[in-house]
Amino acid sequence: MENIVLIGFMGSGKTTIGREIALLGGRFLLDTDQIIEQNMGKSINEIFESVGESGFRRIESQLILWLSANVKNAVIATGGGMPIYNDVAYLGYVFWLDMSFESILKRLTITEQEKRPLFSDISKARQLYNERKSIYKKQSKYIINGDASALEIARKIIECMDKEVQE
């Protein structure tokens, strides 16, 4: 079975929704940021500090190559920048969790914002959000409104995948 690939801006709920899909759909969840943190033994912030954004993006590219060669029937929750710098379409069916920037801000606590290096300046984060939207749209096969509950979104994505299998 093909992978389900979740893309969207930081804080759009990719990991949370991925967990719901995994539970409902008999798949396992792979969060690319968590995989990188475990492999490197550092937080995303620490990786950014030690190798910079370009170094982090190279690590993401290596992970994509590994995932594409070795993983099937999974839910892959990508980091927010992964589809900006890498083609993720060959990992599986790509779903963009589309939410307004304001909805994302409401969802994230201050502590969660501090864990995200690109959220250190809200106006820059908003600009980045606006720049990335068109790329998310190009990379995705499906655009899903991310303002519903995680369970509702997970069910919608599974429904889309069921239709893909039938076709």
Swiss-Prot record:
Residues the record lists as binding ATP: G8, F9, M10, G11, S12, G13, K14, T15
Ligase is among the record's keywords: no
Keywords of the record: Amino-acid biosynthesis, Aromatic amino acid biosynthesis, ATP-binding, Cytoplasm, Kinase, Nucleotide-binding, Transferase
Any one GO CC term of the record: cytosol
SUPFAM superfamilies, alphabetized: P-loop containing nucleoside triphosphate hydrolases
GO biological process: amino acid biosynthetic process; aromatic amino acid family biosynthetic process; chorismate biosynthetic process
SS bond list: none
Pathway: Metabolic intermediate biosynthesis; chorismate biosynthesis; chorismate from D-erythrose 4-phosphate and phosphoenolpyruvate: step 5/7
Reactions the enzyme catalyzes: shikimate + ATP = 3-phosphoshikimate + ADP + H(+)
Gene Ontology molecular function: any one: magnesium ion binding
Entry EC no(s): 2.7.1.71
Location of this chain's protein in the cell: Cytoplasm
Coiled coil regions, renumbered to chain: none
Domain of life: Bacteria
Assigned protein family: Belongs to the shikimate kinase family.
PANTHER family noted in UniProt: SHIKIMATE KINASE, SHIKIMATE KINASE 1, CHLOROPLASTIC
UniProt-listed HAMAP family: Shikimate_kinase
Protein name: Shikimate kinase
Native source species: Helicobacter hepaticus (strain ATCC 51449 / 3B1)
Lineage: Bacteria, Pseudomonadati, Campylobacterota, Epsilonproteobacteria, Campylobacterales
